Every structure is written in C-alpha cells, then in structure tokens.
C-alpha cells in the first residue's frame, strides 16, 4: 500500500464515459483509498474534493455552490506517480455539458453489471428498521387484541390451531370456529394430497356428495349491507319472462365493456351438481358480494385449460361469451322453463369439466355484436349475473337433491373439501375422456339455423384435419417467396417448414429436395409432406410468414457459410452430388448467383451437380429473385467493413491491474483497438506504466510502434477520443522509439530495421535470457541474420559452454538490448563474456 499522502482528503468520485453508459468511478476510488484518502459514497458536507468527469450537472452545481475543489482524473494519477499531494489548480475538472440545454442531455444508464449483495438486517439499515417495525407491530397485536378478532396460531409442527381469548358474539366468527375445530378433530389438511383425497372418497362414499359440515343461518347471509337495488326481485321477474333474452344479451355484451371474465369458477360450478345447490327459499337473498369474491378467487384456477396452457385474456373473454351463449339458449327455451322437472335430467351432464373444456376451445365473437351490446353499467351487471346463474343452478336440482339440501350448506366450503372430490377427479382426466360429455349439451333441444350459424362462427376447427397432406412442388417453391404473406393450409405450412432454421425442418427440406431429384419431371411431381416434429392436434396451425422474415435471413446466412465450409472438402463428382442432395436447393442457386468468387472456388463435381438440374433451376427462379434482397444486406455489411474486429492491437507492459482495467474500459469505449498480450505484426501502440525496458517495449521499438505513457489513455478518456500520441511518447527513456517509428512510417512495404544489417551472422545460445525465440526475433526485426549452428556464426549471444574459437565474439545479451534501445550498434568490447 502506498504512503498516506492524501490522508486529509475526503473525496467524492463521479467519473463517467462521455455518452453516460460506463461508470469508471470504482477504479479511481481504489487509487484514492490506496493513497490514504477517504472516499464518500454520497456528496455530504464532509467532502473536500470531487473527482469529476462527465458527471451529473447537479453534482457540478452543488460542488461549485459549496466551494469544494473540482479536479479531474489526471490529478489522482499525478498524485499517485509523484507520491505527493499535488496542487488541485493544475488539474481542474471540465464540464462539457454545462452550457447544453436540458432537452439535449441524455439520461444515464450504466450498462455494467452491479454487485448483488443480499440484504439482511445486519448489513442494511433500512431493512433493519423495517424488521424492527414489524416486530413491534406483532408484539402490539399480541398484547392489544380487539374483542371481536379471533386469533389464528400455528403449532410447532405446523398445524393450524384456534385459540379465542373471549367469547365472540358474531355468528360469522362462531361458524369459522366450528369449521376449524372440525378440521382439527378430523386432522383434515387445508390442502390434502391426491392420496388423501382418494382415501377420503373410499372411506365415505355415501356422504361425499352431500357432506355439509357447517350450517350458516339465514340472518348471517341476508344482512342489509349486502343488498343492492334490484336484488329483491324474484327469479321469475328476472329470467323467467319473455324479456330475459334481452337482459341476457345485455349481460353478455357488457362482459367486454368491463373486461371481466365470466368463466365459471370451480366454486360456482359446484352448484351445477346436486350437493352444493342452495335452497329455493334463500336463493334470492344470497349475498352478491360473497358470490363475486368467490368468483374472483376461483377464476385463477380456470385461467389454465386442461392441456396445461395459459389462456390469454382475449381467449378467456371470448370463451366466457360463448359459454354464456350456450346457457342462454338452453335456459331461455319456453319448453325448458315450463317443464323444469322433466328436462333437468338431460341437462345434468353439463358438469364443470365440460364447461372448462369449452373454455379452452372458445374463439372471438363477431365484432358487430360487441358494438351493439356495450350498454349496461358495472353495477347492474354483476347482480344479474349472479341471479341468472343461480336460477340456472336451480334447474339442475332433482327431487332427491332437495331433501339432501335440507341439512344445510357450508359457506366456507372450499375447493379441497371432500365434497368436490368427484369434480376435481373429472378435471384431472385427459381431454379425450371428457370429450363425449359435450354432445350431451347439444341434445337438449334442436337448434335453429341462426343459433347453429353463431355456434359455428365461434367454434375452432383448427384441430380437425389430416396429419399428412399433398403439396405440389411448383406451388410449394413458387409461393415460398412470391407470396410470403399468404398463409394457406398447404403453401403456408410448407413455406414455414422450409424457411425455419431448426435442424429438423432443414432435414425435412433435404428429404424434399432428394425426392424431387428422383423424378424425371419436377414440375408435375406431387408428394406428401409429413411433419414429425409437430405435436398432435396442431397439424394445421399456420405460422405467418411476416413473423419469420428474420429466420429466413438467418437461414440464408447460415446456408451460405455452410456452402463455403463444406464445398472445400469435396473432391470428386460423386461427393458433390451427395452434397447437393443434402441441402435446400434454392439456397444453393442463390449462392451461385450471389458471389462470383464462390463460383470459381467450387470443385468441378459440385458445380456440375448443380448445373445438371434444369428442372430445379426453372422452378426456383422466383426463389432466387426473392432471396437476393435478403442477401444484399450481408454483402453491404462486408463492403462497408462494419462488424469486423479492429486491425490495430495495443499492448500493455509494466502496468498494474488497476491501470489495465482502466485501459480495457477506455478501449472498449473509444474503439479502434483490440488488446493483445504480446507485440505482434498488428501492434501499433505499446503502453508502458513505468519506463522499464521490457521485451514488449523492445519488440515495439523494433517494429516501429508508438511507445507511450499511461497518461495518453487518461487524456483520451478526458476528451472522449484518441488524441495525438507525440506528447506522450517515451522518447527520453527510449531514444530509438521515435527513430524506428519514423522509419516504419516512411517504408513502402513491411518494415524491417537496418540496425544489425552490417553485422555478421549471429548464434543465440539456448541458455540465454531473454528466451532464444524472443532474442532471435529482435535480431531478425533489426536486420540481423541468425544462424542455427554456432560454427556458421561470427557472434555468439549468451552463455556458451562449447568449444570456443578465437575468431568468434562471445557477447552478452545486453549488447542486443542496449543497441536496440539506443538505435546504434554498441561497442562489442564492453559486452564480452569472460573466457
């Protein structure tokens, strides 16, 4: 750690890139801490210095208002290199956006990932305060409980218990107490497993349908606060007269207006069976609020259809409207309303499973009906919905059911109660086993022509169809490109399967191309396309080609690269024939017309196999014309040079990791360079953190590179672009650097120095340091000749243990290094190795 030269400094760091997407504050914060400064995370009154670059305007204004010293990042670097507290006035900060309008200034969004620290009460003060507040609130609730609030506690094993402090007057609470006590006695879980449900159904099959563990009195359900204006009217007034059809149509149209689902929830669907229908006496006074709350809770269970897919809001809305239409047709029939006792048996099979199946297949209703029916308000809809539904439930109750209902009904009946076991079991059955239930609904009475038309308009026949179909190859290829927006059953399906870049689809196209080659006349050939990768029940689902244009482009790019890679491996005609049969033919033809270089590079067997197909070429003329537009952007991208990596490389040497991180971030920001670990042919700049003679510095000098200090990067970061290198060149420490750079700039071809051009052949000892390869490279770059054997050399570099000759000079490695550094051949007498 450096000396605490900035021990009296309290700094606030705000260093951003010029476009506001990169935050470099962390690196300079580390440097300040190493120098003994205290870094504040917030701009408080203790801050004495603000390290500022392209920061927020508010920070700049606050610093100027308080008189805090505003310095640039160069001040931090100068203090670190000098090892002393430098005067701040020498490195003032600049605010480039000070005079810009607030409309022009961009919002900042740092693209760097943040360090995620899990918040706990120990490391987060706000979380600790919230935790303490919750603990105090819980303690207050335990000590100061209201008289009418029951206590729900959990035992150590997790079971729910009920511990009332005083007697509760409300019947609602007493009913809940009975229910919880009953659950505790029976050891009944809130959410029993499937094995528990099956065990309950086997233990008590006779009482599973009419079990009513709790009896709620009429007074509890009929409190005055739950009544709305029109709820006292009887069911006959609402749904039994001739005006019921108009009301139902208003109700159905209002569903779209208020965007609420009328899917029958499992709680409401239970009423369609015998066990949970309310009595005739109390139905017109049942609570609408409770009904609606139960409906909203249980709608969640119906948002997934039986196949496990999530139903979108549009599908739910349309499904609810189609379901409402079915119920309206059956309920509004004069025969049905007048002879309830006779027709109840036929409408019994309309169970929850059938209704849910219908929800999953619902489709959108005609838009004309939507416009006509947007009239009712939210207040008038839901009570009517409840009452009409309740009247529909009444029609499903037979004579024996009324006797069973006289024992009472539980208002806390939940989905996991044993009463609903039969219904839940029917939901879990596969869709095929539930399909035979739906024709029972249509057998209630004959439908009129208008009703049949509306049912067919709302039905989805996409699942009815053949699993294989015949497509003509002419239509298949021509409509692939010429009519991309047409999504017919045959052509659209074939197009989507050929354009997709998935491997299975590509193999399918290969098989199609192979079949076409086998026939003598390709234009009139008709064959069957099979879709093995598609799931059953979705054979005729069509994919619009508008959404797959990107996939078409990717397919073109992918196949063109595959052609380049695969054609180079083909050596004879038979292999070329096999290759052409295993890829989509229209891609091959397009590539042949796109690049003349690829035509020349193709082997004879491959090009012959393409040319010998006149039928295919005729068929696919339109395909190539369509794909030319897709290939043009790729060619333009190549011509413009975008997307390529930078050809210049930058090498760092004698630089600590924190400086390297800054350089990497600046290079990523300003572009134009890629970073290399060692000097190579593409290296143009060598950055040296300290003026030390390293191998990378010597190689950079020998190759004519810029040898620069670290300040060049900082000033480039300050100004937002790469600046001139000359003021930052380390020519004082390495005099040869500017000379070699000038020679490299003036040379016409590849640069090679002339320093050792007049010297005899040299042999580099294997025991030399630096390594042999690097020394040989240095000698070669400076124009010298390196011999592989010592007997052919007049100069031996490095320690040599063999037999020595009097005519050979045995020199130290430093002779080469010093000569390159000073750009002159040093006197060999000063570097002779001892005999």
Swiss-Prot record:
Expressed in fetal brain, liver and kidney. GO terms for molecular function: identical protein binding. It holds the Pfam family Microcephalin. The modification Phosphoserine is found at residues 279, 287, 296, 333, 548. The modification Phosphothreonine is found at residue 335. Changing residue 27 to R: In MCPH1; mild phenotype. Keywords: Cytoplasm, Cytoskeleton, Intellectual disability, Phosphoprotein, Primary microcephaly, Repeat. Residues 1-93, 640-730, 751-833 form the BRCT domain. Residues 343-361 have a biased composition (Basic residues). Implicated in chromosome condensation and DNA damage induced cellular responses. May play a role in neurogenesis and regulation of the size of the cerebral cortex. Interacts with CDC27 and maybe other components of the APC/C complex. Interacts with histone variant H2AX under DNA damage conditions. MCPH1 deficient cells exhibit a delay in post-mitotic chromosome decondensation. BRCT domain 1 is required to prevent abnormal chromosome condensation. It binds directly to the SWI-SNF chromatin remodeling complex. This is Microcephalin. It comes from Homo sapiens (Human). The lineage of its organism: Eukaryota, Metazoa, Chordata, Craniata, Vertebrata. The gene is MCPH1.
